[in-house]
């Protein structure tokens, strides 16, 4: 009997293509693969990515900022993972020769109503263990001669890097099998046995545990697996311009964010290429990969509108949303927002650049999920909310997911 059960187990091993099947080849999925193989060498990991290369969406379409962690509620996953992740990301980039720079950044109050919020950020930074220097108006010019404000804080641990290069390096170092052009169409799960995933090219990949790092489609993958995610992804497009006179900005300049929203406002970022990116705003997208107003996917719009939380969110935040749409359709309005920080800028200085889409989880009651959200199902781990600062925090996120996965494998 013992011999027979061992034989059955061997057959089962042969039937699996991998131990862990990761859906999503962005920086979080690849960091998870990297963390699994580092923690448990010999674990067979396969990553399925529907695009022809890694990091084609959220990872590769953002400001490229290594965030300090100053914005996030002390004790939250975002605070813990961003603070830790920023240090680790700089070390990872240095180890593998990936372009990066620790530049520091300014957060600038331009109106009196923002001063209490700026002071609250100072306190939050201290609680999160982040060194912060408070500046009066005259001191802002020490860092940014062209920027104007009533007061500011300087955060020295913020930086910039090439997150796409980081993702590629993670893929290489993980030793995982990466299958590009592998769009997932169906997930079949059998209790206690694992999952079988069918891709658009007709392939079937079997694994013991599924990891859902599908970003903009993570809620759909969760439902395919048979798990209720309890949220829905509402896509928000972030539009950028390139500053035609990059000499106006030395480093990174941010406004004081509204704590009611998980968006940081239109900011100025000198990237590793020396160019200065201006943006993003945050407007509802008409497709999950809706990088412009002309991209409309009726099925995805219908999915968003059928979610009660989308309507509740809209009723609660219509005024904020209206301002964001105005800045999207009017370059003059966008320029006006930038001029609050950088008075010298003109409409002619702003050159349209590539946009991004943020995968924002919204609960049924209309709450915008403000922290990273990771949930487990039977033989599955789902990353259901990982927008900014997930790229910064990707190494700690990957380890957190890996711990759960290895717990399932060892159970």
Give, region by region, the residue ranges found by the protein language model:
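Helix-loop-beta segment of a Rossmann-like dinucleotide-binding subdomain
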Residues: 15, 99-109, 121, 134, ...
């Amino acid at each position: 009997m013992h011999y027979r059960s061992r034989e059955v187990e061997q057959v089962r091993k042969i039937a699996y293509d991998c131990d862990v099947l990761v859906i999503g080849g962005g920086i979080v999925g690849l960091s998870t693969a990297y963390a699994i193989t580092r923690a448990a060498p010999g674990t067979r990991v396969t990553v399925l990515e529907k695009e022809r290369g890694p990091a084609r969406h959220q990872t590769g379409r953002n400001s490229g900022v290594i965030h300090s962690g100053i914005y996030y509620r002390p004790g939250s996953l975002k605070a813990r993972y961003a603070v830790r992740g920023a240090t680790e990301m700089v070390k990872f980039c240095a180890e593998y020769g990936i372009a990066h720079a620790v530049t520091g950044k300014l957060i600038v109050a331009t109106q009196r109503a923002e001063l209490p919020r700026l002071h609250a950020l100072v306190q939050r930074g201290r609680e999160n263990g982040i060194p912060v220097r408070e500046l009066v108006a005259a001191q802002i010019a020490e860092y940014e001669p062209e920027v104007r404000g009533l007061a500011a804080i300087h955060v020295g641990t913020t930086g910039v890097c090439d997150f796409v290069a980081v993702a590629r390096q993670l893929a290489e170092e993980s030793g995982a099998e990466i299958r590009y052009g592998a769009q997932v169409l169906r997930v079949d799960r059998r209790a206690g046995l694992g999952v079988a995933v069918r891709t658009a090219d007709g392939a079937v990949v079997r694994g013991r545990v599924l990891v859902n790092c599908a970003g903009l489609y993570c809620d759909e993958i969760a439902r395919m697996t048979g798990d209720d995610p309890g949220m829905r992804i509402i896509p928000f497009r972030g539009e950028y311009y390139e500053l035609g006179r990059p000499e106006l900005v030395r480093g990174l300049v941010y406004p004081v964010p509204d704590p009611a929203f998980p968006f940081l406002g239109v900011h100025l970022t000198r990237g590793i290429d020396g160019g200065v990116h201006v943006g993003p705003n945050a407007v509802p997208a008409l497709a999950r990969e809706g990088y412009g107003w002309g991209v409309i996917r009726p099925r995805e719009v219908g999915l968003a509108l059928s979610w009660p939380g989308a309507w509740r969110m809209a009723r609660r935040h219509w005024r904020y949303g209206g301002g964001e749409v105005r800045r999207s359709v009017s370059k003059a309005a966008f320029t006006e927002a930038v001029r609050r920080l950088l008075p010298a800028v003109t409409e002619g200085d702003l050159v349209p650049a590539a946009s991004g889409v943020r995968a924002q989880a919204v609960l049924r009651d209309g709450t915008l999920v403000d922290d990273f959200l990771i949930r487990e199902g039977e033989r599955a781990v789902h990353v259901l909310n990982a927008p900014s600062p997930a790229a910064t925090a990707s190494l700690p996120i990957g380890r957190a997911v890996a711990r759960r996965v290895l717990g399932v494998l060892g159970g």
